[in-house]
């Protein structure tokens, strides 16, 4: 399995950093050397700009959250966003999106559904 499928995608990880999630992980998203290239994964925290959390790391962070853990069905990872069922491409993405939703729900003056 490719490493990109075992960590949360760039956008979700960037949002986790913006939400001030502690940036400690095995892998990091690093800015490309050449402009216009895709961000790459590295284990070097010195050149990494923000954490690329693995399924296991996200599993530890989401342990004990309300609701069920993401489940796999019909080629997608599904999780509950309030009363809505949401699909993600990978388990890491589903766990990251669930954590983002939970953090936003806990923020004061949020607009996230509280169910």
What kind of region is each of these model predictions?
Residues 1-115:
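Glycine-rich anion-binding surface patch
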């Amino acid at each position: 399995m490719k490493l990109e499928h075992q960590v949360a995608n760039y956008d979700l990880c960037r949002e986790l950093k913006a939400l001030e999630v502690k940036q400690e992980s095995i892998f990091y998203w690093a800015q490309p050397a050449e402009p216009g290239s895709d961000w790459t994964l590295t284990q070097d925290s010195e050149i990494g700009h923000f954490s690329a959390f693995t399924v296991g790391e996200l599993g530890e962070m989401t342990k004990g959250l309300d609701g069920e853990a993401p489940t796999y069905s019909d080629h997608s990872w599904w999780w509950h966003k309030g009363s809505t069922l949401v699909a993600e491409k990978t388990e890491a993405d589903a766990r990251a999106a669930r954590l983002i939703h939970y953090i936003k729900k806990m923020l004061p003056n949020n607009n996230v559904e509280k169910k």
